[in-house]
Regions:
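Charged, low-complexity, helix/coiled-coil-prone segments
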Residues: 1-4, 29-39, 132-135
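Charged, gly/pro-rich active-site loop segments
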Residues: 2, 71-147
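Alpha-helix boundary recognition
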Residues: 12-15, 59-60, 94
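Extreme N-terminal tail/first-helix region
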Residues: 1-20, 139-147
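Short beta-strand segments
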Residues: 17-50, 55-59, 64-68
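Short secondary-structure boundary/capping segments
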Residues: 11-12, 36, 56, 103-105, ...
């Protein structure tokens, strides 16, 4: 099991938003791109055009990865509809990235992607010794391993 504080600290360290690299894969092709991401209730959200390659790849394979700072995030992604149908998302995105809302949220092909994390890892150093922290959401566990 885990200590609740381990997961609370994780979300504090991740914060409410960030520019993150989203990686998707289908047909043995991995692609990555930077996305403006908001973090709400332990999930990651971004918006994009539903006709873009990333959405076609997610339709074939919903397993995705995000990377930013010292964090790597593995998760399952799904299209939850248009930004206008997800007011909680538009409100959060508008606080962090107001230009993104004004430029793209009302476009007809725009959709919101929701990523539910399954595993998050982070490199940390304590007294110049490297460790990998792992939060496993499917097992509800936290571990810190010396490297």
């Amino acid at each position: 099991m885990h200590n609740t504080n381990d997961f609370e600290k994780l979300w504090q360290d991740i914060g409410t938003h960030g520019v993150m690299v989203l990686s998707t894969c289908a047909d043995n092709r991995v692609t990555s791109r930077s996305m403006s991401v908001t973090v709400i209730g332990g999930r990651f959200y971004c918006q994009t055009n539903k006709d873009y390659l990333k959405c076609r790849q997610i339709a074939q394979n919903p397993n995705v990865a995000l990377c930013f700072g010292r964090f790597t995030i593995e998760g399952v992604c799904r299209d939850i509809g248009k930004p206008c149908d997800n007011e909680f998302f538009v409100k959060a995105l508008g606080k962090a990235y107001p230009d993104a809302v004004s430029r793209w949220s009302s476009l007809p092909q725009e959709c919101v992607l929701e990523i539910t994390p399954t595993l998050i890892q982070s490199w940390i150093y304590e007294n110049d010794i490297p460790y990998i922290e792992t939060w496993d959401f499917s097992e509800s566990t936290y571990a810190k391993e010396k490297q």
